[in-house]
């Protein structure tokens, strides 16, 4: 059995207009994230992990922030595109682990909804998707509530 592991990482700064979209879910918060697309830092990290596992570069290569076509783009559409590339190469996702690093907003009330959206978009069982959150104990830019960072690790298996 052939397997591939991908790691994704993304950061966005607070300061944009609401809504704040994380993992395809609108999370109530006073500001959004500054981004060329919809700023969904969770789905961006997952997309990067999938592309990395497939040795296809990163989301900046596929959806450059200099291209007006992707201005305000729905990150769910971008994620589905990245996953379709993997499917076209004969791979599907076995499991996904995501860590949201943010002092605010509190993520716990939104985790299950985020897992459901990701599972639907990746045509996967929700039990194969883990999303968790942590803080940096008020240290660094996330601790000062200046932005959100996300790491994602994906295991892809040859179909």
UniProtKB/Swiss-Prot annotation:
Domain of life: Bacteria
Keyword Lipid metabolism annotated: no
Record has Metal-binding as a keyword: yes
Keywords: Isoprene biosynthesis, Lyase, Metal-binding
Molecular functions (GO terms): 2-C-methyl-D-erythritol 2,4-cyclodiphosphate synthase activity; metal ion binding
Binding site for a divalent metal cation: 10, 12, 44
EC number: 4.6.1.12
Cofactor field: a divalent metal cation
Pathway where it operates: Isoprenoid biosynthesis; isopentenyl diphosphate biosynthesis via DXP pathway; isopentenyl diphosphate from 1-deoxy-D-xylulose 5-phosphate: step 4/6
Cofactor note: Binds 1 divalent metal cation per subunit.
Entries under PROSITE patterns matching the protein: ISPF
Feature type site, description Transition state stabilizer: 36, 135
Disulfide pattern: none
Reaction(s) catalysed by this chain's protein: 4-CDP-2-C-methyl-D-erythritol 2-phosphate = 2-C-methyl-D-erythritol 2,4-cyclic diphosphate + CMP
GO BP annotations, alphabetical order: isopentenyl diphosphate biosynthetic process, methylerythritol 4-phosphate pathway; terpenoid biosynthetic process
InterPro entries the record matches: MECDP_synthase, MECDP_synthase_CS, MECDP_synthase_sf
Residue positions binding 4-CDP-2-C-methyl-D-erythritol 2-phosphate: 10-12, 36-37, 58-60, 63-67, 102-108, 134-137, 141, 144
Residue ranges the record marks as coiled coil: none
Major enzyme class: lyase
A Pfam family assignment: YgbB
Function per UniProt: Involved in the biosynthesis of isopentenyl diphosphate (IPP) and dimethylallyl diphosphate (DMAPP), two major building blocks of isoprenoid compounds. Catalyzes the conversion of 4-diphosphocytidyl-2-C-methyl-D-erythritol 2-phosphate (CDP-ME2P) to 2-C-methyl-D-erythritol 2,4-cyclodiphosphate (ME-CPP) with a corresponding release of cytidine 5-monophosphate (CMP).
NCBIfam families: ispF
Subunit relationships: Homotrimer.
Membership in a protein family: Belongs to the IspF family.
Protein's UniProt name: 2-C-methyl-D-erythritol 2,4-cyclodiphosphate synthase
Organism from which the protein derives: Shewanella piezotolerans (strain WP3 / JCM 13877)
Higher taxonomy: Bacteria, Pseudomonadati, Pseudomonadota, Gammaproteobacteria, Alteromonadales
Gene: ispF
């Amino acid at each position: 059995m052939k397997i591939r592991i991908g790691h994704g990482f993304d950061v966005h700064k607070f300061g944009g207009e609401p809504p704040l979209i994380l993992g395809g879910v609108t999370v109530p918060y006073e500001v959004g994230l500054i981004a060329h697309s919809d700023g969904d830092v969770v789905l961006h990290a997952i997309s990067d992990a999938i592309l990395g596992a497939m040795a296809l570069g990163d989301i900046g290569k596929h959806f450059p922030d200099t291209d007006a076509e992707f201005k305000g783009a729905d990150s769910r559409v971008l994620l589905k595109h990245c996953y379709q590339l993997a499917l076209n190469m004969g791979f599907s996702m076995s499991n996904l682990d995501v860590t949201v690093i943010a002092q605010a907003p509190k993520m716990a009330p939104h985790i299950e909804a985020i897992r459901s959206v990701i599972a639907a978009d990746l045509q996967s069982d929700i039990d194969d998707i883990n999303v968790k959150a942590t803080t940096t104990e008020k240290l660094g830019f996330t601790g000062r509530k200046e932005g959100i960072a996300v790491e994602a690790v994906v295991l892809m298996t040859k179909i």
